[in-house]
Amino acid sequence: MQKITKDSKCIIFDWDGTLVSCEQLVHASYVLTFLKMGNDKAFTWSEADTHAQNGKSRQTIFSDTTIWGTNTKEAEEIFYQVYPRLQQNDSVLFQLYQDVTGKQLQPLMVYEGAKEFLHYLKIQKPNRPIVLLGAKNEELLRKEVFEAGLIQYFNRIIGNTVHADANKPSPKAFDRAVVNYHISDKSSVCYIGDNPQKDMAFAQSWGATGFILTPEKLREIAQFLPQQVSHKTIPFVACLSTPHING
């Protein structure tokens, strides 16, 4: 198994599902966007439907007429009005979501072990950059990281911009993540995500070394950290996996 060692030149993290859980907020944004548009999908759109959009770019999602019909631009505008309010735990929208779905909405949750893992990577090699590479609007992503209390661990936060071809899941997003870091060997860049298919294919598309990290594995890390003794390699690397991706 490949390991994250002190020789790794840069570590890049996925956000949603890897370090935090905010899929409920994303799902609620879909539901409330449909509701605002008078679309009956507000009552039928499932969490599985939301999950199926994971890994897609903003441009891809909001050009999909099978989801939004012909009002894709309106949907995008409403969605990005709703999501920031949910980020701020807007009680009116939380209640509206509960009225529509019958479910109580959970706010952003930082996974157990996430902060400890980031802290360890930081002290293992203080000058090695740690980057967050997400698929959200960059301003929203930065706000979320700040609210989660994790912003101090990242040298750079990369989210979606208006340039669709440079956004995740395009491999060009990696170029934005490592710009000016003088990376000569792409395999020395570690990309850590939660999706064995999409995240690992994303890493492979650029040449980074991909690792899978789940909430369960983070909990293992949190339990192990008090026993760590070595800074040469991450002793809890066995909690991570590097699945083979068929090209």
List PLM regions with ranges.
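Substrate-recognition "cap/lid" segment bordering the active-site pocket of phosphatases
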Residues: M109, V131, K136-C190, Q197-A201, ...
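Structural recognition of alpha->loop->beta junctions
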Residues: G149-N160, A222-H244
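N-terminal helical cap/lid subdomain that shapes the substrate entry/recognition surface
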Residues: I4-E112, I123
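Acidic, Mg2+-coordinating phosphoryl-transfer loop and its flanking beta/alpha structural elements
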Residues: C190-F224
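A short, Lys/Arg-enriched amphipathic alpha-helix followed by its capping loop at the start of a domain
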Residues: T33, F117-R128
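Short beta->alpha linker loops
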Residues: L25, T70, E112-G113, K136-N137, ...
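Glycine-rich phosphate-binding loop signature in dinucleotide/nucleotide-binding domains
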Residues: I4-K6, Q124-R128, Y181-S187
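Short glycine/serine/threonine/alanine-rich loop segments
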Residues: N39, P126-R128, A208
